[in-house]
Amino acid sequence: YSAEWAKKLGVDSSNLIYSPAKTINDMVDVAVQLMEAEVDIIVVDSISALLPAIYFEKDGDELKSLQDTKQIGAEAKDMTHAVKMLNYANKKTLLVLISQQRNQFGSMHASHIPTGGMAVKFFSSTVIKLWSSEAEANAIKNGVQVGDKIIEQKVGRPVNWIIDYNKLGPPNLSGQYDFYYQGSQIGVDQTGEVLDVAEMMGIIQRGGSWYTIEEERFQGRAKAIEYLRENLEIVKILKEKIYGKI
């Protein structure tokens, strides 16, 4: 965890409790205590990195030798118990479990499954899948100050999302946002999101590559976003119009 990087992403570290849990058991112990304290949000990053009990000697924290930890389904078994306990203990907390996808062996076709077993999915209210391409063609590039020169570098990438499973509303809703990891803008591009949503709702007109924003015209999405970043009062007006149509 980097407090400096978190701050750039908009995290208020003064209101954050950080616990470096390394095992599924540690995660459950800490999460239950936080739930009992009625903490609003808990984020586990990630359940894929947590070790199951099979990695440790009985009644101790000493790691076993690698050859003694090869038990199929050990992580899924422990995560099944974990989500049951967390579900029972939870009264008002939003619990976000971040996972990673793995290749599924033995399948006729290429397929990916999240770690932690099926219980994680079925105990969840909503499952959102995120993915992004590292291809050069999909990278977001911009000029970055390096010494006394401006050099074009990769500064971000588009991220796709889809609601894969949902107990609270319709599934299969999808979308995309831009994430910046370098340059003057760090994190999710909320300005670009306002532009795209306003266009979809007809608040902003677009013809070909031209955008019309409050009677001002711009060629290209990048120019339109640049204008909005320099005119936050226009962003505020667009947000009010968007909320008025929801």
Task: For each feature predicted by the language model, list its residue ranges.
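Short Asp/Glu-rich motifs
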Residues: 4-5, 107-108, 217
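Short hydrophobic alpha-helical runs that function as membrane-insertion/retention elements
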Residues: 16-19, 43, 96, 128-130, ...
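Terminal-proximal interaction/regulatory segments of ATP-powered molecular machines
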Residues: 209-246
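Residue-level signature of catalytic and energy-coupling elements of molecular machines
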Residues: 6, 45, 99, 124, ...
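Long, well-ordered amphipathic alpha-helical subdomains in the mid-to-C-terminal portions
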Residues: 189-223
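Phosphate-binding/switch region of NTP-binding enzymes
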Residues: 72-201
